[in-house]
């Protein structure tokens, strides 16, 4: 039976169905590509408007196989016996074959090839984490060596009038192990603010100035110390003096947090950049960063950055998750992690920006309903004998199928499939819940420390008397014995009836923290010390701004909250930190704050190095990372050094601060 040629009405109906379905696949990114190129850049009227179309492409957390040599020359296998070329043929002729490159020779995705790809991906991921671990571990060994050399030869030659009560209370001869390891080997890790944290961990908050240092880190160190002491007493019947176990506990906690932090940084950067190379470079830069000494000293930077990155991992996976309850679980877990940062450092308050930003993307965007297939067009193409018509529409149909398979999200507020009342209710409930989860650790911490100081136990008063017998205290010292007589904030009512108000008053009283309070002639060297970090931050902010508004042209705040492949919220966060560092707080602390607050600087530097090391240049092959022993920083490439003054200054800054900053801090010189 001969097939009848479809009539014009049938073809028109099929074409109308196709056009309607194709329109439903349009996304905001497609509309941006069709805009006038002259319209690029930041435009305030459109930044807050609802996106049109109200869909965005869901790129997924990572590729199914991020180690495929067909996607990037970076994954080309090492060629033995002949010179490597950067052509596609060299990548496809890799001796590893399809199994090792994760690509199946067959077009069918059978279970066996899928299992091989998963196995290969997991093995490569483990090797990447192994590279990260080597870089992180050996960088700590260098820090320990440098701090020992500096503290041993400098001794107390450069000791200032800063707080050093922990060292004064040490009684030499109590422990040979303590004298050798702690007083000699690790003395460089007990300088400057480390004295404050170690004192709090041992004696709690018995002096007023100690309340400027949040309890998250010293309380953790104290718990570890108590556990070690109890364990040693139960097993051996004896233990080390408190000053020995507290120092060892602080070093152990920071070493553990630093290693975990580097591994988590790899995952966060991979989610944001979809680049294994940039992720590995970011970890290598982090391992030898200019503020590296503060991640090993008895400071709270390592713990703070670990919790921050953990919050990023959970919330970004929640943003990219499938299913409502899965997204809620990840989002609330990430919120708790970000909230804990506020109990560790005061700048954890700014992490609420990330919580609000990512929750907007999680709640206001949802998975798109499946788009049906073009059944009328399929039947029409099967029946038509017009080859020209068939070829034309088959090409359109193929492009439609490619777009139809994309994962997309829709903006719930303007999509007719979602109720605005339900969306508003969910947003309000989650906003209240997330706010409570974020601020609860801080409220608990402030009330705990304030009550410990203003309503002291007899043991704390006794500790002050014991210290006063050993060390002469200044008459201006405010302790738990005279808290009510010499302080005003102890008598003030709590903010909202639940938050103790003391932090700002103590910072102003002891460190002159106020607007323009640090702008003095004698503080110019401190501003010069922060200058390289400030310049890097400004360049990173500019790069992020241009990437979003000039290159990608995503001039819509709602679309930006739905996507994780940009760093605009980190740029805003870093802008606030830079402003506060210049006009408000002690400027010299900006270096360690910016390098321990977000992955922003690491992503910027790693991206810069990535662009310079393309082709067959050293550093653009994954096997080179795997074969690196890790004892030296891997991100140092000749090509970057040859990039004029920028590359040279970058390396001089990072490695100079890593070496000389570590030694200066350990010798009591003003690198704080």
UniProtKB/Swiss-Prot annotation:
Disordered, as annotated region: 82-115
Keyword Membrane appears in the UniProt entry: yes
Compartmental location: Endoplasmic reticulum membrane
Single GO biological process annotation from the record: GPI anchor biosynthetic process
Keywords tagged on the record: Endoplasmic reticulum, Glycosyltransferase, GPI-anchor biosynthesis, Membrane, Transferase, Transmembrane, Transmembrane helix
Effect of residue 361 to E: In qm34; temperature sensitive mutant resulting in elongation arrest and over 80% embryonic lethality at 25 degrees Celsius due to epithelial defects during elongation with cysts forming inside the embryo and/or cells leaking out from the embryo body
Family: Belongs to the PIGV family.
The name this protein goes by in its record: GPI mannosyltransferase pigv-1
The species this protein was found in: Caenorhabditis elegans
